Amino acid sequence: MSYLTQKTIKNNVSFSGVALHSGLNVNICIKPAEPNHGIVFKRVDFKVNNLVYPNFMNVTNTSLNTTIENEFGIKVSTIEHLMGALFGLGIDNALIEIDNEEVPILDGSAKEFIEKIISSGLLISEAPIKIIKINKEIKFTDGERYISIEPSTLSLDIDFKLKYKNSIIGNQSNKVKVFEDDLTDIYNSRTFCLFEDIEMIKKNGLAKGGSLNNAIVVKDKDILNSEGLRNDKEFVNHKILDCIGDLYTSGYRIVAKINCSQGGHYLTNQLLRKVFENKDNFSIVEIKEKNLPHAMINRSLLKSIA
């Protein structure tokens, strides 16, 4: 048994809170799962046909959140922050029971997910992990917005650029090595919106549970949250959190370089669809140290990937 093997949580972890878009109170319980189970949501408010798999092909909505849906029309929405936390902690297998359609927003970041899952402890199995290795550069463009993915050795590097006319948000950028860097600022960064967009968002039936307790609100040159920002790049850092969570709908940790400008849930999902439409674009590799070329072996990096 080593750090190259699959992990789940040691004990059940529960969260309760308001859902950002529906405004309903929701309870979730993350439970341990066997190797090769993967991440699976279970809608316990339904008796049958209630398993929903967070796979990019099951994503049916990317407007202000990522929503997945099974073949019976049962959905789970706003999965991205929880998925980002599971990715970051190296959780390969978990059953997530949820009693409503939307994951609770908590404070708008992945902070509480990370802290409580860590406190529960991790359970390491003997089953080797698998990663997705990108074989060629793939790009998806939507007007001025774009996202690309290209091969990397043993790293997931994300270079993200954000461009807003609002002077508080402005043009922010950040680069992270997901398996190596301290991502505290990424996981602590909250969702955000412009004050002038709130009315339209609510007219579309969204953000019914939104408040200054779970989102940064920017009005002209002011941040309405009394505590201000948690870090200097909180806006772009939150977008990176979303990107990590959405990438995990591939089913595995990805080894690649990501370059994104003005991206979001839609771009990341479309990129994954484009990658997986051709088997020549990627390889699924079972990571066993004996299978790695000697030149690739970096034990500390392998440990961080796992």
Residue ranges: model-predicted function:
Residues 1-92, 97-306:
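C-terminal regulatory domains involved in ligand/effector binding and gene-expression control
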